[in-house]
Structure formats: structure tokens, C-alpha cells
């Protein structure tokens, strides 16, 4: 296996938009510039929201752009399954490891209750859990189970987690104050993102995770999980988010910025070149292939702040 293994990890709840694409391009360039490989994992934990047709469309879009991967997705490979919806048994084993350490507890709080409590929020917008159910007795748990199935949270210590991000530089978060006890499993049995990505990145041999800056606050929680599960953590690089010209964050609801619509207006090389320009990898928005950008790639060139797309670039 190459020294560096990066990954694409799209959630197929809709078509790719420019923000997804930018992260995929940077992940691909970072790995390839180090002579590394790319794994494609489909993050369809919530299978009802992520029909397979969207996963197939994501693969086709990535191929069209020239962002070819080495294993995963429908291509398969030695470290499958590559669809999270097929990995419940794998996640269960890791979940039981955490249970055996006495760190998992049931939580009966609803989302509405948490928001009504005016608890502080993490930088990614989630409520920092105030620990309401952390100290429930066995009798209290049994009584609450009669009315509602619980979700399950991981208990975290009052501890600083420090790491150096490949794009953003040194970063520190306190697990208790900045993150709080976090979900491992929903009440309907679906495993949570934080656990699934740690287990998957480890078993797929991923050594470098490139993703959007909106997930920077997940890193401390994930590093803690790597430690508890005895797994080697990858390096992380969080790239700045793309914003619409009016400053709004791009989402899958922005149809004009979906790759499905952009393909009708631009060639693959034009899209790649304009993104490379937006992220500081070339001085003008000239058409480029991903391969041609490999010698130009450096995290030192990538801005640290979110990027507002210039009017008329797309």
C-alpha cells in the first residue's frame, strides 16, 4: 500500500454541488501529489435518504471530472464493504468495545428538548449536550424505556485534544466543553457519523482525511474514538468552504450550483480550472485537468478562510 491513502466520502442524498466537488478535488490532489491512492466510500448510513441512484450518479460525476479512485464504491476492492449501509455488523463490534469500557449510556432527550434548554452549540451548529441523562439510575432508565426507545451517547472527559490540521494549522478543543457527550447510535438503531467514519477510515487504511471546514469540530471527537478503539488516526486537512456570491453557504438545495446543471454549461476542464483558481492553485480560471494540477498543488496556497465565489465565475 502507498504511504498515503486519501478518500472521497460523499453522502448520496442528492447530486454533487460545487462545495462537495471542491473537497473531492483537493483530497484527490493532496493524495496524488504525494504519490498516494484514493478510496471511494459511500456514506449512506441513512439509507432511506440516500437512494443508490444518487450514489451511482456521484460516481459518474467524479469519473466525468477525471477524479478517478483506486478502490471502493461500485468498483469494490479488498477493504469493503464500501457502502456504510452494509456495515452495521462492523460498527456493532466497535460499539460493543466502547460499551465494555463503561462509556456508553442511553439518552432519552429529544432534539426539541435540547434546543429548548438553550444549551451552547458546537461550531458545526450542533447542541453541546448538557449531560441530562448521564447520571440516570438503572431504575430511572427502566422507567423511561417504557415510554421511549433511547439513543446512545459516548461519555467524554474534561480533556483538551490538540492536533495540527494540514490546512488550518494547530487546533485545540476540549471534549467536554466544546463537544459534549455525543451520539454513537440513534434510537432507531442507525449508527452515528462519528463512529462510522472512524471505523471505516481505519479498516480502509486511510491515512489522510480531507474534508470541509464545517467538520473541523468533529476531529477531536474522532481522535478520542481512535484512541478508545486502539486504532491509528489519520492526518486531517479541512479546506475552506465555498460560499455563494451573496455569502450563503452552498448546499444541495442550490440547484444552479449542482454539477448536474453545471455540466450543461461547462466542460469538466472548465469546472476544475475555475475551482483551482478559487482555491489559489492557479492565477486565472483557465481550463485544467486534475492531473495537470498535481505539480501546482500545495496546502500553503489554499486560503484559510471560507471562499466567496466571485460573481460570474460559475
Regions found by a protein language model. Name each.
Residues 1-15, 33, 38, 65, ...:
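Non-catalytic terminal extensions that flank enzyme cores
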Residues 1-118, 122, 213-214, 218-231, ...:
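N-terminal Rossmann-like or analogous alpha/beta NTP/dinucleotide-binding catalytic cores
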Residues 46-56, 244-246, 295-303:
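Short, mixed-charge aromatic SLiMs
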Residues 55, 88, 111-114, 126, ...:
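Alpha-helix initiation and N-capping motif
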Residues 65-73, 103, 129-142, 265:
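Short, basic, helix/turn surface patches
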Residues 82-97, 121-127, 150-158, 278-293:
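Short secondary-structure transition/capping segments
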Residues 96-100, 202, 263, 276:
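Alpha-helix boundary recognition
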Residues 112-251, 258-262, 311-314:
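Active-site cores that bind ATP or allylic diphosphates and position pyrophosphate for catalysis
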